[in-house]
A protein has these predicted regions:
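Cleavable N-terminal signal peptides
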Residues: 3-4, 14
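Sec/Tat signal peptide C-region and signal peptidase I cleavage site
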Residues: 12-18
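Short amphipathic, basic-aromatic surface patches that mediate peripheral association
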Residues: 21-33, 56-60
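N-terminal Sec/ER secretory leader and immediately downstream segment
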Residues: 24, 39-45
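Calcium-binding acidic motifs and repeat modules
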Residues: 31, 44-47, 160-167
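Short coil-to-beta strand junction motifs in C2/discoidin
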Residues: 32-39, 117-120
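Structured domain cores in non-transmembrane regions
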Residues: 45-115
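Glycine-rich, aromatic-bearing surface loops/beta-hairpins
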Residues: 98-103, 111-167
Length: 167
């Protein structure tokens, strides 16, 4: 019966990988600070939307008032946001404080499980009430045949955005 462990290995996905996306929200020296709304998604090189990974916004405002400012993340709103029913299960979350926040996805996550072989971007967009807006793209290829890290550095609303893939 030593065949079963070997069969289990053969049944594993051919390109299993863990994907980590870290987003730094910098401390800003402003009179009135509001935590930014942040959207993270996957797009093709032609900027067509593939999948949403996270949307951080004010979930707890009465009468869903927090949803009103989602459109300030203009690219997210145009690509996919306006067609979504919020909150989105498994995607929506509360705004985050200053610091670095890491999201981890395995190969079974719906966004990566059916992702065809090809080149893509992880897109991170941030917008802040009484503040600015910033968008960063981090290119990657899927599936990954070796471990790698790619990053982009923000200038205002975002700090370092880093994506690492570990097959």
């Amino acid at each position: 019966m030593r065949v079963l462990p070997l069969l289990a290995l053969l049944a594993a996905p051919a390109f299993a990988a863990d994907v980590n996306v870290s987003v730094e929200l910098p401390r800003l020296d402003v009179a009135e600070y509001h935590k930014p709304y942040v959207a993270i998604w996957i797009e093709q090189p032609n900027q067509s939307h593939v999948a949403n990974l996270a949307v951080w916004y004010d979930l707890k405002m009465a009468n869903k008032e927090g949803e009103k400012w989602l459109k300030d993340m203009r690219q997210f709103w145009r690509r996919t946001g306006r067609s979504l029913e919020f909150p989105v299960d498994g995607v929506s979350g509360a705004t985050k404080a200053v610091g670095t926040h890491t999201l981890t996805f395995d190969h079974n996550h719906p966004a990566f499980k059916t992702l065809p072989k090809g080149d893509y971007n992880i897109v991170v967009e941030a917008a802040r009430e009484v503040g600015g807006r910033e968008l960063l793209r981090v290119p990657f290829s899927w599936p990954a045949d070796k471990a790698y890290t790619a990053e982009a550095q923000g200038k205002t609303e975002l700090g370092l955005v880093k994506m690492s893939v570990t097959p």
